[in-house]
Each structure stands twice: as structure tokens, then as C-alpha cells.
Amino acid sequence: MPQYRSRTSTAGRNMAGARALWRATGMKDGDFEKPIIAIANSFTQFVPGHVHLKDLGQLVAREIEAAGGVAKEFNTIAVDDGIAMGHGGMLYSLPSRDLIADSVEYMVNAHTADALVCISNCDKITPGMLMAALRLNIPTIFVSGGPMEAGKVKWEAKIIPLDLVDAMVKAADKNCSDEEVDAIERSACPTCGSCSGMFTANSMNCLTEALGLSLPGNGTTLATHADREKLFREAGRRIVDLAKRYYEKDDATVLPRAIASFAAFENAISLDVAMGGSTNTVLHLLAAAKEAGVDFTMKDIDRISRHVPCLCKVAPAVPDVHIEDVHRAGGIMSILGELDRAGLLNRDVPTVHSKTLGEALGRWDIMQAHDKAVFDFFLAAPGGVPTQVAFSQNRRWNELDMDRAKGVIRNKANAFSQDGGLAVLYGNIAEKGCIVKTAGVDESIWQFTGKARVYESQEDAVEGILGEQVQAGDVVVIRYEGPKGGPGMQEMLYPTSYLKSRGLGKECALLTDGRFSGGTSGLSIGHASPEAAMGGAIALVEDGDTIEIDIPNRRIALAVSDEELARRRAAMEAKGAAAWKPANRERVVSAALQAYAALTTSADTGAVRDITQVQR
């Protein structure tokens, strides 16, 4: 029987000093025998997805204490990728994932907490906490802040749904008036919550449902809706039960590594492919699998992406469907239900809320559920009132979207495409693979051949696109923006947004060893591995080279001979210390980012640390 970890600092005469300090935090005599539950909150006033979380940790804490536990809350950092986008701030986004993972580990282990509630929401916070949970392997449950309501703007007598990406695209469109841009800016992000499309934050929160580490509805229940409060309260009660099952009944099935098994990771990427999730999820799932000790690789993602269909298209893949619409169609449990009926799901994996995922689907998938409370739960609608207050409205749709032929969620027979929403491409320019979000690519350009227009940084690429250097038929190549080369693997949302604003969204491709925002659509291929700074062939591309992209056959190729590539590689190596570095790029890289670059690995392994460099 495992002993409560907290007994290390709460039991025995020699711990009188530690108990004195615990008492100073408010603990009393009867508390020292209870499980100590850490609450990792990520409240910050910098990020709309986190601005409403300030009091929610204590909401969870009260439920923990009512259920017989002791709750101790702490905070970790959160970076807003949208605000950090397009300038040096984006260098810090991906590295913050590792800092978040470390900070949670530090706090939980330093204070010997028994279990963990992760209150996350946005792009790097959920992945960072997920990595920490799998590293710590103590009972853990995730509850996110929830998605933002979609924006709506009235323009020329039309009500137009929109989101953050629309603001970026329209701002760079010379045909849009200042008045229209201002109206969109003021309407694009109306409430607290993670941005309203199937961007990285919402994708990751949905994937925690598939991994079995969060409650049904975690990924899709709006931040503003009263129903989300139920998830926070249930998480507080549930974590005490999980802790007691492990420490008092020796039930190891409640541990994160038992739940997030290889089969669960297969379910997560199947969901990702089916819902056309952000390409960043690939990076984060690979990193999480590494922490879990699960041998889940790009080859597994490639394998799954070839036979799982695209069952759901959400902004940015389509302009008028947002996460609130997915919720109305039954949320993530209903997408998983369709995968299950297609024979594409591992049903027998445990979750934090049910004995098996299959059992959970029987209750929560609206196509097979019988509980009126479940139907009512998925009728939760946007309130339509700008606010930064959580749980501030209780509006309901009149009816659910249960149309699996033409609705937001489709069944396999009526899939948007039998090819999934994500694909891994391989070739001489990306020998270890690269990722494209096919759900956001018009099928007319799934096969594309163009001339390379090469840039050594995102900033130069933006200047080239807005300066009209890039023309229809070009393949924009942005290199030395990988985890090591950036450093920090910047997102390329501005380049793709500016291509759209120039009307080139279906006329050009973009290839990078950096990554893309979940808000990106178009023929945008990222995570090219190995990256340029680690000797990848993307560093050898020259202006005017022909690049061939073939999504159906999962192929990408630089149309030069092996001999020519070898010649270019030899010429690069001959540069000595200047080899595999960007030419004429001026960029201030802080000591913190240099330390990150020294240990990070390429995108095909999740950009995790190479700890062999520090192990003795």
C-alpha cells in the first residue's frame, strides 16, 4: 500500500518544524492525516483565457476540503501567444511550456503533495501541466478555464461570426476600411476564455478528454457558462476520491501514466485528426508521451492519420463554426462516439471519471445517451454579452445538433474527407517529417508545386509578403525558426494571415522548421525536421528551387539531385563556425533562451530537452 507522500512532512516528532509551518498556512490538528491536494492555477491578467481564473482555485479548494482533503493552491506562468505574436516575445512561448512543467514539479515535490488539480487553459499551459502530471505520476485531474464565445460583428446589415484571426487578416487587407477593422477588433474576442476556434488551446483541452485526464465537456463548455462551474466543483470532489483510491486502496489505475497509456495516446491523436486540431498538438503529445514513458512517435501519428477521417471542421478551417457549435453537437464525447462506431477507438482505457472510456461514451455521447441532464448540458449556449466573468450566463439552445450527415460533427459515412485533418509528410527536405493541417487546406491545392522564396527569419518573410516579393505559385520557406535555431520555434500566424490578406491563401504554400498557430489555415507546413540549425535539408534550399508537395501521398520533395544536395551540404560544412546559422540575421537572444536552445531537440521528438547532456 503506497504511503501518502505528504506524511514525509506531516508525520512524526521530527517534523514538528514542518508542521509548525503548515499550521501557519491554516492547517489544524485533524488535517495532518488528510491527503494534501495541490491546485496548480494559471491565473494572469495578461491572457484572456486566464483572466477569469483568479477565484476558481479557491472554488476547487472548498470542494476538496468538503470531500475530506486539504487544498493548497499555487500559481504558474501563462504566455498569451496572440499578444506575443509577430515580435521577439514569440521566442518565449514554447520554452514557457518547459518552465511550466518544471514549476509544477518543483512545487508539488518540494511540498510532497499527494495529488494535483491542474487549472489550465491556453496554448502552452495545458501541455506544460500535462508534462508535469505525467512526470510526477500522482493522481491528477485537469479542468480548464474554457473557450471564449465567438465574436460577431454587424457589417452592411449582416451578422458575421469572427475570431482573433479575422482581426489579423483584415488589418493587413488594404481593401478593408479603418472603420471595418475597428469594428472587427472590438468584436473578435468578446469574452474571457481561450480563443473560440479549434486553435491550440482548445485543441489541447479537448485532447485531455480523449486522454482520460479531464471530465466530459472540459474542452467545449464555454468559460462564461454556468455549467462550467459544475466541472470545477466536480474536479475538486473527484480528486479526493482518486487520491484515496490510490493511497488507501492501492488502486494504481487512477495514476496519470496508467490512464495516459499508448492506447490513450492513440485515442488522442485519432481525435486530433478527426477534429482537425492544431498542428501544435503533435508537438505537445510527443512531449507528453516522452514524460509518460510511452513510445509514441511521429510514425504512430502518420499511421493513424492515414485511416482516421475528418469528422469535424471548425474555425480556422471554416469561418462560421466555433467551439460553442461543437459543444451543441455533443462535444468531444460525440466525436469519440463516432470514432468508436467506426471501429477507430480504444474503448477499454480508464479515465478519471469512468471505469473505461467506452462506459463513459454510453452516458455522455448524445447519440446513445438517455439522461436528460446530459442533453441539457450540451445545450449550453453563448450569452452574447461581452464579459470577463466566469459562469456569468446560463443561456440554452432550443435544440441539439444531432445531424451526423450535414451537421458540425459527422459520422464516418458523411465525413468531410476520409483523409484526416492532419498529415505527416516526408521527403528529402524533411527526412524526419513535417506536419500540415489538411482540414484547413483547400483540396484543390493538396498537390502543389512551386518555386522557393527563402527567408532566414519570420520578420524577413513578413516584410517580403507585405512588400509583394511573394507571388502566386511561390513556396515561402522560413528557416532557422526551429526549437534550437529560433530559438523557441516561433509560430508563423502573421505570415499566413498576410498571405490571406493579399488573396494568396490558396495560391501559395509555406514551409518552415518553425510552427504554426492553431489559427493558421492554408497550405502551411511546419515542424520540418531536422530543423535548419541541426543540419536539416531545409537549410540547403535556394531561391528558385522547385518544391513539390503531395498531401495524398504524404510526400514533400526538393526537386534537386542527391548530388546537388551533397554539394550544398559540403559547402555549408565548409563554413565552419558559421555553418547551419542564419545569414545576416540580427536577433537578441537572452541567456534564458540560449540555455533553452542548448538542451532542446527537434520538433519530431516534441522539442523536449535532451537530458542526456546533463545526466551523470
From Swiss-Prot:
Pfam families from the UniProt entry: ILV_EDD_C, ILVD_EDD_N
EC number of the protein: 4.2.1.9
Modified positions (N6-carboxylysine) in chain numbering: K124
SS bonds (residue pairs): none
SUPFAM superfamilies, sorted: IlvD/EDD N-terminal domain-like (SSF143975), LeuD/IlvD-like (SSF52016)
UniProtKB keywords: 2Fe-2S, Amino-acid biosynthesis, Branched-chain amino acid biosynthesis, Iron, Iron-sulfur, Lyase, Magnesium, Metal-binding
Molecular function, one GO term: dihydroxy-acid dehydratase activity
Pathway per the UniProt entry: Amino-acid biosynthesis; L-isoleucine biosynthesis; L-isoleucine from 2-oxobutanoate: step 3/4; Amino-acid biosynthesis; L-valine biosynthesis; L-valine from pyruvate: step 3/4
Catalytic activity annotation: (2R)-2,3-dihydroxy-3-methylbutanoate = 3-methyl-2-oxobutanoate + H2O; (2R,3R)-2,3-dihydroxy-3-methylpentanoate = (S)-3-methyl-2-oxopentanoate + H2O
Gene Ontology cellular component annotations, sorted alphabetically: cytosol
Presence of the UniProt keyword Iron-sulfur in the record: yes
UniProt binding sites for Mg(2+): D81, D123, K124, E491
Top EC category: lyase
Gene Ontology biological-process annotations: isoleucine biosynthetic process; L-valine biosynthetic process
InterPro entries xrefs: Dihydro-acid_dehy_C, DihydroxyA_deHydtase, DiOHA_6PGluconate_deHydtase_CS, ILV_EDD_C, ILV_EDD_N, IlvD/EDD_N
Gene3D superfamilies listed in its UniProt record: IlvD/EDD C-terminal domain-like (3.50.30.80)
Swiss-Prot/TrEMBL cofactor(s): [2Fe-2S] cluster; Mg(2+)
Residues of the active site: S517 (proton acceptor)
Cofactor descriptive note: Binds 1 [2Fe-2S] cluster per subunit. This cluster acts as a Lewis acid cofactor.
Residues annotated as binding [2Fe-2S] cluster: C122, C195
Role according to the record: Functions in the biosynthesis of branched-chain amino acids. Catalyzes the dehydration of (2R,3R)-2,3-dihydroxy-3-methylpentanoate (2,3-dihydroxy-3-methylvalerate) into 2-oxo-3-methylpentanoate (2-oxo-3-methylvalerate) and of (2R)-2,3-dihydroxy-3-methylbutanoate (2,3-dihydroxyisovalerate) into 2-oxo-3-methylbutanoate (2-oxoisovalerate), the penultimate precursor to L-isoleucine and L-valine, respectively.
Assigned protein family: Belongs to the IlvD/Edd family.
HAMAP family, sorted: IlvD (MF_00012)
Subunit-level organization: Homodimer.
Protein name per Swiss-Prot or TrEMBL: Dihydroxy-acid dehydratase
Species of the source: Azoarcus sp. (strain BH72)
